[in-house]
Amino acid sequence: MNYLIRRKTKEDCAPVVHVATVVWNETYKGIVDDDFLNKLYETEEQRAKEIYNKFNEEDNHQLVLEVDNNIVGFVNVGDTDDTNYDNCGELHAIYILGKYKGKGFGKKLFEAGIEELKRMGYDKMIIGCLVGNPSNDFYKHMGGKLIKTRIFLLFQLPENVYYFEKI
C-alpha cells in the first residue's frame, strides 16, 4: 500500500469534502442528528464548489493522505479561537476513511499536522473532539491532556478539549 501526505491543492477540494462527508456519517451516527448527516451527501457537490471558490494557497494548512493515488484522509490545522494559551495552534480536523483506520495513518497525519503547526510558529496545540467520538481515545494515546469540555456550537453538543503542552 503506497501512501503520500502532501499539501492540499485546489483540485483536492471535492475529494476532501467527500472524505469529510463519509467520515462524519461513519463516526457521528447516534451522536449528531441523522437528518444533518444525510444532508451532507445531498450538499456535497455544492460544499465542494464553495470551498474550491474560497481556496487560498497562502492560508492553506490542510494536508491530504493519498493511498494508492486516492485521497482517503486529511488533517487541517491552524490558529485557535481559544485565547487561554500562548503560542497555541489547533488541530481542527483529522479524518480518515474507516477502512484505512488502524493502519498507522492517523498517527502519520497527526504528526504531519504537528509539523505544519511548528512551521506556523506554534509550540503548543489543542484539539476538540465531540464526546462519544472514538477518536477521544486516540488523542489521549497521542499524549493529549483532557483540560475541559466545552460546547461545540454547530450542534450544541459537548466537546472534549485536549492540550498538548509541547509539540
Which residue ranges define each predicted feature?
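Generic low-polarity alpha-helical segments
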Residues: 31, 50-51, 107, 144, ...
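Short, solvent-exposed coil/turn linker segments
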Residues: 9, 108, 163-166
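Conserved glycine-rich acetyl-CoA-binding loop
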Residues: 93-111, 118-120, 130-137, 141-142
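C-terminal "cap" of GNAT-fold acetyltransferases
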Residues: 123, 127-136, 140-142, 148-167
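Acetyl-CoA-dependent GNAT
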Residues: 3, 7-13, 18-32, 37-99, ...
